[in-house]
Amino acid sequence: ILKYHKWHIPASIGLGTSPHDMLDDYTRVFGNNIRQRFPVVDTEIGKLGTMTCHDGATPEVSRALGYNGVEVICHPTAMQEVEGTSPPWDFWTFTRRTRAHDNMCYILGSNWGTVKHEYYPKGFCPGHSLIVDYTGMLLRQAPYPEEQVITATIDIESLREHRTIINHNMWIDIRTEGFREIYENPIYPPNRFPSGHPPKNQAEKVETTKTVLNTLYQRGQFVPPHGMNPDEMPGVLDQRIQRAQSQGTLLKDDE
């Protein structure tokens, strides 16, 4: 009933690309407005949207869906334990509760309960699938890393009534003009891998992050560690890439 393409893909994981990596080509085919990039479909059971895995790690995709009127976000993921899926870090739970709260919508988050491959440990993706309501309340959560079913009531009429209340209404008090500069200054460069020119290997994707780091340090958003200056920071990533290549965990360009 809708088609969505994952927007945020970590440079350090896999060779997948985002619409942003081929932005000019993508917009020619799929359009250049927020409703086409982050579609919400109006159905008899509510207004539905989706975001995929790393899309939920930052606020922008859920905010775009909220702007488009979403009431239920379906959110499939493959979050690993090393990313903080379980307590005490619990990154998976508190960020998704925040996305639901800030956009006054339900989030149905389905995470891998295990990965049955020899090269992954059994608890590599530890589950913790969840259902969060429009206030950010955790209604249900799967307690362990195996296949299971969780249920909760999705009360769309209650959500719509909640949105009529002025107090603690997360959309009423947004003052967009004060934040425009954040999004007018690019961070991750677009069109890195245009149509027909996918990344050859992981190192090619990671290379882009040097540009991003340089931007963040040069404009003073990030402060270098003690004894270093901003101009040195891209070189730090070069050293890490070379070390990973020497260890065989990151392929070289000619491999």
Task: List each language-model region with its residue ranges.
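Active-site catalytic loop in hydrolytic enzyme cores
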Residues: 1-76, 80-94
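C-terminal beta-strand edge segments of enzyme domains
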Residues: 2-3, 102-106, 111-255
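Solvent-exposed alpha-helices and their adjacent loops that cap or buttress functional pockets
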Residues: 33, 40-44, 100, 122-123, ...
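Short alpha-helical segments used as structural interaction elements across diverse proteins
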Residues: 34, 93-96, 160, 172
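Intrinsically disordered, low-complexity boundary segments flanking structured domains
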Residues: 37-39, 94-96, 135-141
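Short, compositionally biased leader-like segments
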Residues: 84-110
